[in-house]
């Protein structure tokens, strides 16, 4: 399975005992690798348009294998903070996106078995940030996004559909009130985001 979609929560006890510290990685620019040759700039946190905190359960399916990762998410006008946890409650990855830089931490020894925190951030932002926030970043690499009431699809520079996101929320409700299904059409994996609880607050108006 591609490293970016592996979510391993059942880690052996021996590995856990040898991996009890977080590894800090150097801050990087506000972009993520969406394939081996392409870097995509991310929208700013404030472009979401509101502040958001949530507990979510991410389920990743590839072929016949499904793994789960509980996450906590906080979005404010100046930053995005997320943390992923093991099934026993240990924080195993975290990320902060602020001041156009991304800083990540992964539990020592687990880097090869966990999704890259930047990819978790990309999936979150692609599902929730408005299409207007994504227009310029996608246009800069020749990609574009088509949005409907209950889905959005990302097309590459060859007009091939690459990612399709389906929203199962009831009409007129926030996208996170139902499951969000993220399908990578070329790499063949599916991510389901279930929001267990959330709080949404309008950002203060600029004077």
Predicted regions and their residues:
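Post-signal-peptide N-terminal segment of Sec-exported extracytoplasmic proteins
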Residues: 38-77
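C-terminal motif of bacterial Sec signal peptides marking the signal peptidase cleavage site
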Residues: 16-19
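Bacterial N-terminal signal peptides that target proteins for export
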Residues: 1-9
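Bacterial signal peptide processing site
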Residues: 21-24
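A mature extracytoplasmic/lumenal domain signature
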Residues: 84-88, 97-101, 106-110, 195-197
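Acidic/charged, solvent-exposed loop-and-adjacent secondary-structure segments enriched in E/D, K/R, S/T
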Residues: 102-129
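Extracytoplasmic beta-rich ectodomain segments of secreted or membrane-anchored proteins
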Residues: 63-98
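Gly/Pro-enriched, hydrophobic low-complexity segments
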Residues: 141-207
């Amino acid at each position: 399975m591609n490293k970016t979609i592996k979510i391993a929560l059942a880690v052996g006890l021996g590995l856990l005992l040898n991996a009890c510290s977080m590894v800090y990685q150097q801050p990087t620019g506000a972009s993520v690798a969406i394939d081996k040759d392409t870097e995509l700039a991310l929208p700013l946190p404030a472009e979401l348009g509101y502040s958001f905190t949530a507990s979510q359960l991410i389920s990743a399916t590839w072929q016949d294998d499904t793994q789960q990762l509980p996450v906590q998410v906080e979005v404010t006008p100046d930053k995005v903070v997320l943390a992923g946890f093991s099934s026993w409650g240990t924080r195993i990855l975290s990320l902060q996106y602020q001041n156009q830089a991304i800083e990540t931490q992964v539990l020592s020894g687990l880097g090869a078995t966990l999704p890259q925190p930047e990819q978790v951030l990309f999936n979150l932002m692609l599902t929730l940030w408005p299409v207007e926030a994504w227009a310029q970043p996608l246009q800069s690499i020749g990609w574009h996004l088509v949005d409907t009431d209950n889905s959005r699809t990302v097309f590459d520079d060859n007009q091939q559909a690459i990612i399709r996101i389906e929203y199962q929320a009831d009409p007129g409700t926030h996208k996170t009130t139902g499951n969000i299904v993220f399908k990578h059409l070329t790499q063949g994996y599916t991510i389901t985001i279930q929001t267990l609880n959330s709080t949404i607050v309008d950002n203060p108006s600029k004077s």
